[in-house]
Regions:
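Hydrophobic anchor at the beta1->P-loop junction of P-loop NTPases
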Residues: 5
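P-loop (Walker A) phosphate-binding loop of NTP-binding proteins
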Residues: 8
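Conserved lysine of the Walker
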Residues: 13
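Conserved substrate/cofactor phosphate-moiety recognition/catalytic segment
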Residues: 22-59
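A basic- and aromatic-enriched beta-loop-alpha substructure that forms the phosphate/nucleotide-
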Residues: 61-99
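A glycine- and Lys/Arg-enriched "phosphate-lid" helix/loop adjacent to the NTP-binding pocket
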Residues: 87-158
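Conserved small/polar residues in nucleotide/adenosyl-binding loops
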Residues: 179-184
């Protein structure tokens, strides 16, 4: 079984992934944010570093998806290849951070990759307000995230809604975290 956890930056994906893995004995797969050689530069100069950063994430997420698809273990995954493309890459393209050539190349690569794998059995989408996201981002203290513009998070939230409602074709469970200040407490109750 493959469960993917989707949600904006700071929504509680890692928290929920950890909780589900512990509770059900599933193997957790975490997004490797500490090992992306472009991520810190990306937050300093988004336009310059969008394409290499997005390609790096695509490569890593596809590698994870291949390993998951070849495994007999039940896996819970923190962020999927699908939201990476339909939320983050499309947002960068819409903001003018990717030109048409880079975007088209990226999308062709993504389509070729996803022809080789299946959708997760279930995607759990963590819907959260921007104030909730900012609170969690501040709490975890990653330096490169601290100067993230609020409109960037707002745009990502809009893209997530489009992704879940219009683009993703697999099964989805949505958990709303709009009015809570403690994601771990809220997710424990779920």
């Amino acid at each position: 079984m493959h469960i993917a956890i989707a949600g904006n930056i700071g929504s509680g994906k890692t928290t929920l992934t950890t909780m589900l893995a512990k509770r059900y004995g599933w193997k957790p797969r975490f997004e490797s944010v500490d090992y992306n050689p472009y991520l810190e530069d990306y937050y300093k100069d988004i336009k310059r570093w969008s394409f290499p950063m997005e390609v790096f994430f695509l490569k890593e997420r596809f590698k994870d998806l291949l390993e998951i698809s070849r495994s007999d273990e039940s896996v819970v995954q923190d962020r999927s290849i699908y939201e990476g493309v339909y939320v983050f890459t499309e947002n960068n393209y819409a903001m003018g951070n990717l030109d048409d050539r880079d975007y088209e190349t990226y999308m062709e690569l993504f389509e070729d990759m996803t022809d080789a794998v299946q959708f997760p059995d279930l995607m759990i989408y963590l819907r959260a307000s921007v104030s909730h996201l900012v609170s969690n981002i501040e709490k975890r203290g990653r330096e490169y995230e601290q100067k993230m513009p609020l409109d960037y998070l707002e745009n990502l939230n809009k893209r997530y809604e489009e992704f879940i409602k219009e683009k993703y074709k697999g099964r989805v469970l949505t958990i709303c975290l709009l009015y809570t200040s403690d994601a771990a407490d809220e997710l424990t109750r779920v």
